[in-house]
């Protein structure tokens, strides 16, 4: 439980500076998706999202006002108890200034990853950037060249065309993933498998933590 004695003006100032952040939850678990699947990591889910996908599985993260404000010192003190790898996710973490938090994490020799839609300016010091673009609000151009992996959620077959459009914008080193939307996985997986077999630059990303009932 975090108790704050500052007034709203002071809180807003620290939020704008990235010295405090709205945190929906944080937890130590196994990364279930993408290149680092199977790796232990401490997840920090930052509240607030300006994209709002209808199939989002953490819609409760969208409204930052519903979640406690935490200082980055508190966040890092908690994270360093668990792992030398932190994954910052949301919501959409780039709605906030990520420079102070990521700088402090790296001062403690913690590897820092982000999962983002890329809808806002890229801030922060990152060891790995997972870019997961959304049709509702496309990434800003500057982030494409920085992405280490591109993850496209496939809700219907038309998303494959969107995936190809997005793949043209990232660098050659970027790893390309197609991931079925969880509720549509049985319907979409055969389509994705066939597509990847015909277009081998793509890999399949599965939410393995859900298959294995890992939180």
Regions found by a protein language model. Give the residues of each.
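Conserved Radical SAM active-site core
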Residues: 8-11, 16-28, 40-43, 47-126
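Short, P/G- and charge-enriched loop/turn segments at secondary-structure junctions
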Residues: 30-32
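S-adenosyl-L-methionine
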Residues: 34-37
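Conserved AdoMet/S-adenosylmethionine-binding subsite of the radical SAM
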Residues: 94-215
